[in-house]
Amino acid sequence: MTLTTEDFNYDLPHELIAQTPIKERDESRLLVLDHETGAMEDKHFYDIIDQLNPGDAVVMNNSRVMPARIYGIKDKTGGHFEVLLLHNIEGDRWETLVKPAKRAKTGTKIIFGDGALTATVTKELEHGGREIVFDYDGIFMEVLEKLGEMPLPPYIKEKLDDPERYQTVYSKEPGSAAAPTAGLHWTKELLEKVEQKGIKLVYLTLHVGLGTFRPVDEDNIEDHKMHSEFYQLSEESAAALNEVKKQGGRIVATGTTSIRTLETIGSKFNGEIKADSGWTDIFIKPGYEWKVVDAFITNFHLPKSTLVMLVAAFTGRENILNAYQHAIEEKYRFFSFGDAMFIK
């Protein structure tokens, strides 16, 4: 049966889109879903510890969101530009989204702030993408911290008082254009409790890129082309995960970015987990054969998105749509600053 984008649609009341983070990260709600039976339980995120067993591994993406949105003016004419950094190609060369794209022709020079940072458009890409080369004095990330702002998703209309609330407590590798949001619920204290229970904490890196902002345009989901994102799994993390597998523990992924990294590696090495880095455009959808992940934490995703499709690949389409309907009836909060699910 060919699945269409419409098969992953659902009606979400606008007021359930969370506009601000909840006061305490781990007091968000948690919908526990059994992927085989479809059985559900309403909990809070701090109850996650009861869902984890000694010998399991919790995998987290330690990518950090860059203050990736910067505003500049065109050299000579003074026209305004908004530039969103997507990923670092090499050195000072970046793939970006520039608005208005039509004014950013190859050779255009853009000035940011008082001129401490300038950029030249070197290549025009599809979807308003532009390759640009930056010029500055000092350390790029420090210059960016001064001039850039957090690129919150378009459905969040309120200003974020504390930018750290759009970072996970363990974020350390700058490079994402959006947060790996399932991880926003973890607190340092809760992670310590998890570790004390005999559960391994394992980190990987996937820099969240352009695809997060790109809807599925095709009716037939098979026609959708996924974006590429950079990932990295260290020798140490691979060894820890293999040890857990060997002892019969579960690999519990925090978020779709951790899932995509682990399943990319599992697909590449015939189900084995090895240290690896590279670019992934894996599209996990119903019919996918899972290689590594046994259970996962995830937020509630946008209708018709590739992320709903990924979750449906694990739970079955009917189970996940039923769970979303339950969450709507129970007034769970949706999307980046919303509540979480634990799917086992």
Swiss-Prot record:
* Listed SUPFAM superfamilies: QueA-like
Keyword Cytoplasm on this protein? yes
Which biological process terms from the Gene Ontology are attached to this UniProt entry? queuosine biosynthetic process; tRNA wobble guanine modification
Ordered alphabetically, the record's keywords are:
Cytoplasm, Queuosine biosynthesis, S-adenosyl-L-methionine, Transferase
Query: Which molecular function terms from Gene Ontology are attached?
Result: S-adenosylmethionine:tRNA ribosyltransferase-isomerase activity
Principal subcellular localization: cytoplasm
Q: Which InterPro entries match?
A: QueA (IPR003699), QueA_dom1 (IPR042118), QueA_dom2 (IPR042119), QueA_sf (IPR036100)
Fill in the subunit field for this protein. Answer: Monomer.
Concerning its family, UniProt says: Belongs to the QueA family.
What the protein does?
Answer: Transfers and isomerizes the ribose moiety from AdoMet to the 7-aminomethyl group of 7-deazaguanine (preQ1-tRNA) to give epoxyqueuosine (oQ-tRNA).
Database matches in HAMAP family: QueA
Q: What name does UniProt use for this protein? A: S-adenosylmethionine:tRNA ribosyltransferase-isomerase
The root-end lineage is:
Bacteria, Bacillati, Bacillota, Bacilli, Lactobacillales
Gene field: queA
